[in-house]
Curated annotation (Swiss-Prot):
Pfam families (UniProt xref): TAL_FSA
EC number: 2.2.1.2
Family under the similarity heading: Belongs to the transaldolase family. Type 1 subfamily.
Keyword set includes Transferase: yes
Gene: tal
Lineage, top ranks: Bacteria, Pseudomonadati, Pseudomonadota, Betaproteobacteria, Burkholderiales
Protein name listed in UniProt: Transaldolase
Primary localization: cytoplasm
Localization in the cell: Cytoplasm
A Gene Ontology cellular-component term: cytoplasm
């Protein structure tokens, strides 16, 4: 029997969402994604502490920021030894509202990868999908630095990223699901509100349809999954980035997987493009309580984990 994971790979590029790169080989993903929380989690495991310790030891007299950049590249370099495709490395979330510093950090990370002998075609720089992050991506893309727009929860963010020429977006399925489930409280009915009706799944489907309808080349990579059901409902999406625990569940399953998204079978096609000048973007984002709250929360969580990583480094100096 063909596993659900192998079936999914027929329709979608499978990406591993982890800093724990020793798990990669068994799932054979094309690409991999990391974020501050995943790197923080990894460096606290015995298997990866030596990478953190060596990076601090080699650059003991440099700034903490300098050391973190080298740590990100160390993880990215190891990951790229195990996959054929690209790795995503994230810009510090504390730069989410600073276009110029985000541009500078993106350039610096690419420079470090290239110094390690890795071509920029194998790297995606992750930026928060704020107005400022999207403007940074526009500049970086024009320089041949490909960007993965993260913390994306709404069509207006997706539309702005596509107009800016971003290589790829990461709409967060699970966090959208979490918000609506919490809002519904006791009224939430998983049988009725999950599956194809899952609000996170519907959000990605809407974005995918918008992109294909208007001919955007920005790749759509569903992210932040809570269940294999959410993944199966998005079979056919350009890419899906999946945590090792859910990759394992897909590998253990022989349930049939059918293509749910296809550029040749679009439903509920939009008739107009979303207005995305700065004022329109900010108003539409503000008008979406879920997207506003989850974007702010996501930035806070990633920023807090960056601070925790700094403290780990300080303790090793």
């Amino acid at each position: 029997m063909t596993t659900a994971l192998d079936q999914l790979k027929q329709y979608t590029t499978v990406v591993a969402d982890t800093g724990d790169f020793q798990q990669l080989a068994q799932y054979k993903p094309q690409d991999a994604t990391t974020n501050p929380s995943l790197i923080l989690k990894a460096v606290q495991k015995d298997a990866y502490k030596p990478i953190l310790e060596k990076t601090v030891r080699d650059h003991r007299n440099e700034s903490t920021d300098f050391i973190i950049d080298r740590l990100l590249i160390a993880f990215g370099t190891e990951i790229l030894k195990l996959i054929p495709g690209r790795v995503s490395t994230e810009v510090d979330a504390r730069l989410s509202f600073d276009t110029q510093r985000s541009i500078d950090k993106g350039r610096e990370l690419i420079k470090l990868y290239e110094a390690a002998g890795i071509g920029r075609e194998r790297i995606l720089i992750k930026l928060a999908s704020t107005w400022e992050g999207i403007r940074a991506a526009q500049v970086l893309q024009q320089e041949g630095i490909k960007c993965n727009m993260t913390l994306l929860f709404s069509l207006v963010q997706a539309a702005a990223c596509a107009e800016a020429g971003a290589q790829l977006i990461s709409p967060f399925v699970g966090r959208i699901y979490d918000w609506y489930k919490k809002q519904a409280g006791a009224d939430w009915d998983e049988a009725k509100d999950g599956g194809a009706n899952d609000p996170g799944v519907q959000s990605v489907r809407r974005i995918y349809t918008y992109y294909k309808t208007f001919g955007y080349h920005t790749e759509v990579m569903g992210a932040s999954f809570r269940t294999t059901s959410q993944i199966i409902e998005l079979a056919g999406c350009d890419l899906l980035t999946i945590s090792p625990d859910l990759l394992q569940k897909l590998q253990d399953s022989n349930d049939p997987v059918e293509r749910k998204l296809s550029p040749d079978a679009l439903h509920d096609k939009p008739t107009e493009r979303v207005a995305i000048d700065e004022a329109s973007f900010r108003f539409q984002l503000n008008d979406d309580a879920m997207a506003t709250e989850k974007l702010a929360e996501g930035i806070r969580v990633f920023a807090a984990d960056a601070v925790k990583l700094e403290k780990l480094i300080a303790a090793l100096r």
